[in-house]
UniProtKB/Swiss-Prot annotation:
Gene3D superfamilies: 3.40.50.880, Carbamoyl-phosphate synthase small subunit, N-terminal domain (3.50.30.20). This is Carbamoyl phosphate synthase small chain. Keywords: Amino-acid biosynthesis, Arginine biosynthesis, ATP-binding, Glutamine amidotransferase, Ligase, Nucleotide-binding, Pyrimidine biosynthesis. InterPro entries: Anth_synth/Amidotransfase (IPR050472), CarbamoylP_synth_ssu (IPR006274), CarbamoylP_synth_ssu_N (IPR002474), CarbP_synth_ssu_N_sf (IPR036480), Class_I_gatase-like (IPR029062), CPSase_GATase1 (IPR035686), GATASE (IPR017926). Residues 1-168 are annotated as: CPSase. SUPFAM superfamilies: Carbamoyl phosphate synthetase, small subunit N-terminal domain (SSF52021), Class I glutamine amidotransferase-like (SSF52317). Small subunit of the glutamine-dependent carbamoyl phosphate synthetase (CPSase). CPSase catalyzes the formation of carbamoyl phosphate from the ammonia moiety of glutamine, carbonate, and phosphate donated by ATP, constituting the first step of 2 biosynthetic pathways, one leading to arginine and/or urea and the other to pyrimidine nucleotides. The small subunit (glutamine amidotransferase) binds and cleaves glutamine to supply the large subunit with the substrate ammonia. One of its GO terms (molecular function) is ATP binding. The lineage of its organism: Bacteria, Bacillati, Bacillota, Bacilli, Lactobacillales. GO terms for biological process: 'de novo' pyrimidine nucleobase biosynthetic process; 'de novo' UMP biosynthetic process; glutamine metabolic process; L-arginine biosynthetic process. It catalyses: hydrogencarbonate + L-glutamine + 2 ATP + H2O = carbamoyl phosphate + L-glutamate + 2 ADP + phosphate + 2 H(+).
Length: 357
């Protein structure tokens, strides 16, 4: 293996072995605390443009299979691992972790201290980083990193460009794709929903003309304020159709109702985040992947907070007081992670049924 460098914006440099595609890339450095589920995480479009560090000490031990993709074309910039398994084994495995990264043109680095990287990000917040081949021109690479401006509106490159159906016999649901995970479609299909997936910039009029029973606002990457057209669409359809928002969809729904969002210091990325439902006191362990959150300060009168994160008390769910609409910051579809909150899809079914009465 050739040597590769991970250069952080604060000047810290980590040297390790090359993994995956032979590319030099720059992105936002984040970390994920999950112990498994690396395939689902890498193929989650919410990691668009990010260099994903796995805190678990060994990654790739069960290879990659055809069933656990959350999107076919992953858009994360690179992966960072302490150790990439050299002898993976699983009955579903189709290729190794390294083969998968090469097939998807994703570079990586192995043999670095991921605990130290995570500590830096926790203390100083998410930052830019570059993954490059080890050369003698480190100062030049550092100056290039400092000068790089990361792209905005990553939803545009994560969303479908054309509408497509996923037919079934039940409730008609329009799924607005901001970078959706396939597991959301699976959960809705399990409930026999007749789905139409549409691009992120689909207008309210186009959605209303489809006469759906409900609208799903999916997860996706980046800053929700970069998608003003979606915020306007939500303003126009709420009250007319039941709405369920997840992750970025939750943030967009909140913005459409006058709430504010903010960039978190290092975000929530993992599968063990405890969330409390305020009405019942119920605790769910949830899968999360977000760097922005809805502010609890000066929350609009029309919204009520339904869920909070146990560790930092951040907003994890809201419900509209007058319209049939609610949203959560976490992923009730899991994939990977616990299925504690999958009942929320059933709540969405009930919301649609009651609205028709």
């Amino acid at each position: 293996m050739s040597k590769r460098l991970l250069i952080l914006e604060d000047g810290t440099i980590f040297e390790g072995e090359s993994l995956g595609a032979n590319l030099d890339v720059t992105g936002e450095l984040v970390f994920n605390t999950g112990m498994t589920g690396y395939q689902e995480s890498i193929t989650d479009q919410s990691y668009n443009g990010q260099i994903l560090t796995f805190t678990y000490p060994i990654v790739g031990n069960y290879g990659v299979n055809r069933d656990d993709y959350e999107s076919i074309h992953p858009t994360c910039k690179a992966v960072v691992v302490h150790e990439a398994a050299c002898r993976p084994s699983n009955w579903r495995m189709q290729m190794s972790f390294d083969e998968f990264l090469k097939a998807k043109n994703i570079p990586g680095i192995t043999g670095v201290d991921t605990r130290a990287i995570t500590k830096i990000v926790r203390e100083h917040g998410t930052m830019k980083a570059s993954l490059v081949q080890a050369r003698d021109e480190v100062e030049h690479q550092m100056s290039q990193l400092q000068a790089t401006v990361l792209p905005t509106n990553q939803v545009e490159t994560s969303s479908t460009t054309t509408a497509y159906p996923s037919p079934n016999t039940g409730r008609k649901v329009v799924v607005v794709d901001f970078g959706l995970k396939h597991s959301i479609l699976r959960e809705l299909s399990k409930r026999e929903c007749n789905l139409t997936v549409v691009p992120y910039n689909t207008s309210a009029q186009e959605i209303l003309e489809m006469e759906p029973d409900g609208v799903m606002l999916t997860n996706g990457p980046g800053d929700p304020t970069d998608v003003p057209e979606a915020i306007e669409m939500i303003k126009e359809i709420q009250g007319k159709i039941p709405i369920f928002g997840i992750c970025l969809g939750h943030q967009l729904f909140s913005l459409a109702n006058g709430a504010k969002t903010y960039k978190m210091k290092f975000g929530h990325r993992g599968f063990n985040h405890a969330v409390r439902e305020i009405a019942t006191g119920r605790i769910d362990f949830t899968s999360q992947n977000h760097g922005y959150a809805v502010s609890s300060e000066n929350l609009p009168e029309d919204l009520m907070i339904t869920h909070v994160e146990i560790n930092d008390d951040s907003v994890e769910g809201v419900r509209h007081k007058h319209f049939p609409a609610f949203s959560v910051q976490f992923h009730p579809d899991a994939a990977p992670g616990p299925h504690d909150a999958s009942y929320l899809f059933d709540d969405f079914m009930d919301l649609m049924d009651n609205f028709k009465k």
